[in-house]
C-alpha cells in the first residue's frame, strides 16, 4: 500500500483523508500536516493518521502527495 501525505489538513485536506480512511486505506500510511497542534491532535484522534507540522518530513517518505492549501 502506498504512503500518502496530505499537505494542509484543513477542511479540504480533512475531506480527502476522511474519504481515504473510510474507503479502507490504512490510516498509518497517511501523514497530514497542519500548523496548529490542536488541529493535528484532533485529526490523529478522529482518523488515526500520523501528523506533523513539517511539510518536508511529510513528503520525504511518501509515494503520493496531495497539496490542499489556498
Regions inferred by a protein language model and the residue ranges of each:
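An anion/phosphate-binding loop that grips the pyrophosphate of nucleotide cofactors and donors
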Residues: 62-63
Amino acid at each position: 500500500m502506498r504512503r500518502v501525505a496530505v499537505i494542509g489538513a484543513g477542511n479540504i485536506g480533512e475531506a480527502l483523508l476522511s474519504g481515504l480512511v473510510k474507503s479502507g486505506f490504512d490510516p498509518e500510511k497517511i501523514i497530514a500536516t497542519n500548523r496548529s497542534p490542536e488541529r493535528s491532535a484532533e485529526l490523529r484522534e478522529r482518523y488515526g493518521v500520523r501528523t506533523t507540522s513539517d511539510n518536508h518530513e511529510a513528503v520525504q517518505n511518501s509515494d503520493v502527495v496531495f497539496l490542499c492549501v489556498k
